[in-house]
Structure formats: structure tokens, C-alpha cells
Amino acid sequence: MSIVRRDFRSELSGEKGESMNTVLEKIRKMGIVPVVVIENEKDAVPLADALCNGGLACAEVTFRTAAAGEAIRLMKEAHPEMLVGAGTVLTVDQVDRAVQAGAEFIVSPGFDPEIVDYCIKKKIPVLPG
């Protein structure tokens, strides 16, 4: 068995949004990415307001609730400058729904080759856990 290391960061830039390097640089500058679970989309904008007003214009919205996609959309609509990603992404369908909602990066809880390859192909920054 051989292990192949692949640095895919340079492959992730294009028309879909920011490059992987740009997203990672923004995260590095923030120092922390709050991981949030939003059960009700009405909580999304007040949360985004609080994060941005507190100097932390970044969030990873977990895709474990039915409200996640709409929450991402509302957060990006209220704060276009905010870096918003989708976390706990388990399927390619969730990748598509998250990106359509405005997610700028994808986080998966483990390394799923299907999700990573799909994101690379679609030029979506992905952080497999």
C-alpha cells in the first residue's frame, strides 16, 4: 500500500469563488472559525451581526439541520464580507446545496474522496477533517 500526498490547494481557484489559498489566509488572519449549529434560520442574521460586530466575520455553519442552507444564504445576504462555510458536509448533494446558498468553503468530518474530488473538480475550497 502506498500513500500519495496531493497538494490540491493550487487546483482550487476559479469562477466559483475564492481560491483555497485565499480562504486559508482569511482563516489564518481570523485565528479562529466559530462552528455554529443553527436550528432556526431566524437566528442566522442576529448571529452574523454579533460575530461581525465582535470582529469575527467568519463562521462554519454545520449542515446537520434543515435550516443550514437558508441560514448560510441569510448570513451572506446580511454580511457579504463575511467568510461563511458549511461544515459536517457528508454528501455531494450537500456540497451543491451549501454552495448554492453561498458557502465559500466546505468542511467534511473525515476524508471522503468523493466529496474532495468533487470539490476540486468544481473549484470549491474543501477542508476534509
What are these language model-derived features?
Residues 67, 93, 99, 104-129:
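Conserved anion-binding
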Residues 19-101:
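Conserved N-terminal beta1-alpha1 strand-loop-helix module at the mouth
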Residues 6-19:
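Short, Lys/Arg-enriched N-terminal segments with co-localized hydrophobic residues
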